[in-house]
């Protein structure tokens, strides 16, 4: 049996950031982090596009806006201190049609309200920044950047262990129950006990929450995001980061071009329903998980409302020319021959019972349990601040 003051479930970047921040502020209170895989950062974090988000898209005052802005500063400081390579390269958000201008204006207004360094640009300035882009106007965000979040996680893992706290891999949580003031977790490596539990289980955060006494009407619906690498000889088509104007009805940013910190250029992702919570390939099927998604009232309402968009995403997934067509709206010179299939990611998206996509970070808490229920993008950028806030919340429970 293992025991600690705090037990964290989930070894992605949010769980690791929380563990590190706790260890910094409470060096005398023990912590155990449990990860079901054989190493850290195997899922959302390890399949991240590596963008340091500025916070331009998010509703002012929202958890995403606040944590992204503060988290980005903390992430840059951490990278400098730990000698992790990152680059503030800038990005452009591009309107290709007149009907996108109102949404572009709203993004710019949000950026200003959130304190983001951004400017509206015309077609000629757009061409100066990205000579191969097609657009009628746009927004330049000089402070956006790129980093390898897996490297950040490796460094966090080392620092957590240096604090004297434990990271236990291959430790899947099977059941959770409470006895007096203790939380008892039954895992594949035996019993783990703690006074406080933080659920950072990402794609399975609702499942872990369901093992506790807390109940929720939301459910995680997995959306696969598929990527392509651009062949080296065509990387000149994008100098830094090129994004479209996203559909304001969805918390997805649309297929875009991303230069990577260690070289190379990738494009994507789309957002297609995955048939398994860890369904990184189109052929991946977990029948019970897929059936659970289909039976969920919230998903049924979501699918009924947005079936056309869903079918379009599915079409782009199966038919490469359709994916290429979406990219050509931004960079007309890109062709199907320029693209090489890259690893996909899966986004853990919380959906409510009424069919709404949860658009903000969601934290559910009781006296001794904190569940981070919805932490998709920009959670990697925001992770160090999320970890700091969770640590502060936990601290109020210690007498």
Regions found by a protein language model. Give the residues of each.
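Beta1/beta-strand and adjacent pyrophosphate-binding region of the FAD-binding site
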Residues: 1-14, 32
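Flavin-dependent oxidoreductases
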Residues: 17, 176-286
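Glycine-rich FAD pyrophosphate-binding loop
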Residues: 23-47
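Glycine-rich active-site loop/strand segments that organize a redox cofactor
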Residues: 41-71, 82-86, 273-309
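Dinucleotide-binding Rossmann-like beta1-alpha1 core, especially the glycine-rich loop
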Residues: 50-125, 135, 254-255, 276
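Short beta-strand to alpha-helix junction loop
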Residues: 59-70, 94-103, 139-159, 168, ...
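Helical element adjacent to the flavin cofactor pocket in flavoenzyme catalytic cores
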Residues: 139-196, 200, 204-207, 382-395
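C-terminal catalytic lobe of FAD-dependent flavoproteins
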Residues: 282, 297, 302-399
